[in-house]
């Protein structure tokens, strides 16, 4: 069964546009150094979908990516404790959804994005996924 996630990146480090340029091969999502986020990465399966969130600058959901390779050891982690996944670009939102708008939308204000602001990889329930897709003016993927 497909699962839904949100992953964060600082756009000056890795943006949705850079993700798009990575093409069908996608890009490795690495560098995550939080144990709860790591645990979420290990639960990701091929075909799962993730909202792509620009953190720090913008603070908004800007698109959707798909997991194309499930968790493997993160080569940037010298200790071997953390994992990475590989994701490919699916769609960029015409209307990015700001954190402020998410906080003000009662139906999705419960999300970890609001409650655990430092968490960089988090699950998204299907009902919230549908609402956010509608808000971003994309068809439900």
Where on the chain are the PLM-derived regions?
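Aromatic- and Lys/Arg-enriched surface recognition patch
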Residues: 62-122
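Charged phosphate-binding loop/patch that engages nucleotide di/tri-phosphates or the phosphate backbone
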Residues: 124-141
């Amino acid at each position: 069964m497909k699962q839904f996630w949100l992953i964060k990146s600082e756009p000056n480090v890795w943006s949705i546009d850079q993700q798009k340029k990575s093409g069908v091969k996608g890009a490795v999502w690495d560098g995550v150094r939080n144990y709860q986020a790591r645990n979420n990465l290990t639960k990701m399966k091929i075909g799962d979908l993730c909202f792509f969130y620009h953190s720090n600058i913008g603070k908004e959901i800007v698109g959707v990516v798909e997991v194309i390779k499930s968790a493997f050891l993160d080569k940037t982690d010298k200790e071997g404790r953390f994992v990475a996944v590989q994701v490919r670009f699916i769609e960029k939102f015409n209307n990015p959804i700001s954190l402020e708008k998410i906080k003000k939308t009662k139906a999705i204000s419960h999300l970890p994005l609001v409650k655990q602001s430092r968490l960089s990889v988090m699950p998204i329930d299907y009902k919230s996924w549908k609402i956010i897709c509608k808000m971003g003016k994309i068809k439900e993927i």
